[in-house]
């Protein structure tokens, strides 16, 4: 379809409400938003070297708030609905995948509950997603 696809992966279990820094990954069907952002010349590009090797399995790790803000800015630039996939890690071994579509025309984010929604940590995962 002609809806851009973006994937975000949350690696730590800290809630957004606590203000803790989060490490995440973003993919898109048309290429990486992070790679297309200011990785080569921005001051935040040095933060990517601070990412742990355990995250190397992800396509692109976002290690700073500036990186996350740049990805969000690029997602919000679309004038057509954007498909966003969010992977939240509940534990080291368990994660849930949330599929969503952001419609920029009416500023509504549609979120589908994951089919593999595990009872363990489900409240925390849902709160973290919000």
Curated annotation (Swiss-Prot):
The keyword Protein biosynthesis does not apply. Residues 1-56 are annotated as: Disordered. Residues 17-27 have a biased composition (Polar residues). Residues 1-14 have a biased composition (Basic and acidic residues). Residues 32-51 have a biased composition (Low complexity). The keyword Transmembrane does not apply. InterPro entries: Acyl_CoA_acyltransferase (IPR016181), ODC_AZ (IPR002993), ODC_AZ_sf (IPR038581). GO terms for biological process: positive regulation of protein catabolic process; viral translational frameshifting. Keywords: Developmental protein. SUPFAM superfamilies: Acyl-CoA N-acyltransferases (Nat). One of its GO terms (cellular component) is cytoplasm. One of its GO terms (molecular function) is ornithine decarboxylase inhibitor activity. Interacts with ODC1 and thereby sterically blocks ODC homodimerization. Belongs to the ODC antizyme family. Ornithine decarboxylase (ODC) antizyme protein that negatively regulates ODC activity and intracellular polyamine biosynthesis and uptake in response to increased intracellular polyamine levels. Binds to ODC monomers, inhibiting the assembly of the functional ODC homodimer, and targets the monomers for ubiquitin-independent proteolytic destruction by the 26S proteasome. PANTHER family: ORNITHINE DECARBOXYLASE ANTIZYME (PTHR10279:SF10). This is Ornithine decarboxylase antizyme.
């Amino acid at each position: 379809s002609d809806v851009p696809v973006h994937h975000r992966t949350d690696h730590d279990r800290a809630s957004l409400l606590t203000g803790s820094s989060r490490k995440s990954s973003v993919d898109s069907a048309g290429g990486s938003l992070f790679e297309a952002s200011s990785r080569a010349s921005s001051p935040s590009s040095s933060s990517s070297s601070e990412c742990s090797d355990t995250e190397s399995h992800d396509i692109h790790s976002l290690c700073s708030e500036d990186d996350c803000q740049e990805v969000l800015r690029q997602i919000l630039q679309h004038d057509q609905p954007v498909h966003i996939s969010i992977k939240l890690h509940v534990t080291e071994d368990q994660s849930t995948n949330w599929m969503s579509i952001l419609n920029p025309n009416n500023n509504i984010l549609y979120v589908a509950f994951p089919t593999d929604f595990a009872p363990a940590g489900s409240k925390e995962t849902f709160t973290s997603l919000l």
